[in-house]
Structures are given as C-alpha cells and as structure tokens.
Amino acid sequence: MNPTQSDELRDEPRGAIELPVSRTRGGAVDTAHDFVGQEWPVALVFNGISHAVMMCTPCDLEAFAVGFAISEGIVARGSDIKDIEVILHADAPLPHAEVHLDVVQQAFAALKDRRRALAGRTGCGVCGIESIDLLDLAPERVPDTGFLARLAPDALARAAHALPAHQALTKLTGGLHAAAWCDATGAIRAAFEDVGRHNALDKLIGSLVLSRADTTDGFVFLSSRASYELVRKAARVGIPLVATISAPSSLAIEIAKAAGLRLVSFCRETGHVDYGTV
C-alpha cells in the first residue's frame, strides 16, 4: 500500500507553511515570519465513491486513511483494503488531496448501507451523520491481554514528560494535536500530529495497522481532551488505555466503561485522574 502522488507534488508537505506576520509586543509592532499548520480538505474515496471530506494536515495521509477506515468500522482489518492511492493537488487554487481506497466488496456494501456522508470540520468525528440512531454507542469489549497489569506505575508520567519532544510541528506552529503510541514503561514508540485530534489518532491507528503492530499491547497518549469519538476509535481496535492531557467528556467516560477501556485524563508528570474501566 504505497501512496502514489500527482505530478503536481513529488514530496508530501511537511505540515506547516511560513507566512509573513505583524507581531505586537509591548506596544511595538514588528514584521516577521511565522509558521502555521497546514489544513487541507482531504477526500476519502472508497471504491470510486466519495465518502468523507475531512479537514486535516496533509502528511501521513496513507496512515490517516487506513486508520479512518478501521476506526470508523468501514473495514474490519487492514487486509480488507486491497489498494490505496494518495493524490495531492498542492498547486490548485485550494490545495487539497484525495485518498482512494479499494476495499473488499463486503465492506463496500456495508458502507453504502450506512448512508453516511461526512463533511468534516477539522476532524470532527460525527459531522454529517443523518440521525442520532446512527451513533455507534455500543463498543465491543476490549480484550484483556494483561497489558494493564504490566503497566509501570510511572508510565503515564513518563509519557507526559516525553510527548513534547515528539511534537515537532506543534513546537513550530503552536497549534497541532498529537497522538502517541506508548509501551508498558511509558516510552513513546510512535507519534503523529494533525490540526484535528481525531485525525492524529487515525494516523496513529493506521500506522499501527500498516506495521501489523499489536494494538492491545500499548496505550495511546493524546495531547487533547478525551471526546466520545476518540475513545470509540481506540476501543474499536482494542487499545486498552487512553490517556489525555485535558478533560474527558461524560460520554467518553461512559463509552470507556462499556468497552472495559481504562480512561485517564489531566495527565501530568506529577499525577493524573483515573476514570476507571468498569
């Protein structure tokens, strides 16, 4: 599943662009240059049919598309995706991208039955859903592989300390979210950034799927709050623990409990708040 690109751009954007700005400090105005995170419309096309247009940072798009397909339940496993093509239109009046996925017929038929057309605002996970009845609020139970029993007491503190070093785009722009994959000691093994927190998680999940990693043998550390969609995505792929820097929502806590997933928020080097698993 190697992405192919249009003739317009041979290398993916790095996720930030430099722009001239006027900076006011202490009453003095100065001209300077600053970096801002890129935000592009990215169309996700399944078997030739456009299913979603998400607003995201145009890098790691293959991983993003695979993660979206898995975490939204469009496909059950990575092998259900037969081919994938990333097309970048960097020189268009509105820079945008398309990701074409060829999925097995069973998955495509189920997708058409869902009649779901998303028009995402910066990675919004339920934009465009046609009715409340279509909300997926009954997660599968996360398998108990013994990972939580192996989790080091200082794993969350260690991950909180290490995350900034994996946020190159955030350091450059000050405005992106990060999703990191951590082992039982809290060491960060992979991290992805995006203007949308859901997109960052999808990129991480897609990367894990593409590398055939065991998604039950680690935890996710997020730079954002814990919303229902993020917890639901993690539960779908069997991730046993979601840790976030900011607050959880009430529905995120309910979904975590229903899935048997441990949800921990307000994570700092000095402590955290555990919302339980049952």
From Swiss-Prot:
BP-aspect Gene Ontology terms: Mo-molybdopterin cofactor biosynthetic process
Predominant place of localization: cytoplasm
Keywords assigned by UniProt, alphabetized: Cytoplasm, Molybdenum cofactor biosynthesis
UniProt subcellular location: Cytoplasm
InterPro entries: Cytidine_deaminase-like, FdhD
Pfam families for the chain: FdhD-NarQ
Active-site annotation: 124
Superkingdom, natural source: Bacteria
MF GO annotations: sulfur carrier activity; sulfurtransferase activity
Cellular component GO terms, alphabetical: cytoplasm
Function: Required for formate dehydrogenase (FDH) activity. Acts as a sulfur carrier protein that transfers sulfur from IscS to the molybdenum cofactor prior to its insertion into FDH.
Family membership: Belongs to the FdhD family.
Protein's name in the database: Sulfur carrier protein FdhD
Organism expressing this protein natively: Burkholderia cenocepacia (strain ATCC BAA-245 / DSM 16553 / LMG 16656 / NCTC 13227 / J2315 / CF5610)
Lineage, broadest ranks: Bacteria, Pseudomonadati, Pseudomonadota, Betaproteobacteria, Burkholderiales
